[in-house]
């Protein structure tokens, strides 16, 4: 279920403050954040965010196509190593 339109998109206050501060100072350094739940807004276009995936920070450069998505969608938390049997089937053939 999506968020109500009357509530508007969610973004953590501290992340918005960091974004506006970087925009005013024209700072190009990546913005470090743990806020995977924040929605990407048009004000964030052109910035790089280091999004934490639980282990390391993944750099995410925001473009127009990212608007409306969550920051966490671009920093995967799980690594898929493949199914156990599929490797042995390839070797056997």
UniProtKB/Swiss-Prot annotation:
GO CC term, one of those recorded: small ribosomal subunit
Keywords (A to Z) from UniProt: Ribonucleoprotein, Ribosomal protein, RNA-binding, rRNA-binding
One GO biological process term: translation
Keyword hit for RNA-binding: yes
Record flagged with keyword Cytoplasm: no
Record Gene3D superfamilies: 30s Ribosomal Protein S19, Chain A
InterPro entries: Ribosomal_uS19, Ribosomal_uS19_bac-type, Ribosomal_uS19_CS, Ribosomal_uS19_SF
Sample GO molecular function, one term: rRNA binding
Biological function: Protein S19 forms a complex with S13 that binds strongly to the 16S ribosomal RNA.
Family in the record: Belongs to the universal ribosomal protein uS19 family.
HAMAP family reported for this sequence: Ribosomal_uS19
UniProt protein name: Small ribosomal subunit protein uS19
């Amino acid at each position: 279920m999506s968020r109500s339109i009357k509530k508007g998109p969610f973004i953590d206050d501290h992340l918005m403050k960091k974004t506006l501060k970087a925009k005013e100072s024209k700072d190009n350094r990546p913005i470090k954040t743990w806020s995977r739940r924040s929605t990407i807004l048009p004000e964030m276009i052109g910035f790089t965010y280091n999004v934490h995936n639980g282990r390391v920070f993944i750099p995410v450069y925001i473009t127009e196509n990212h608007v409306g998505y969550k920051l966490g969608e671009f920093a995967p938390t799980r690594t898929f190593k493949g199914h156990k049997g599929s490797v042995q089937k390839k070797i056997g053939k």
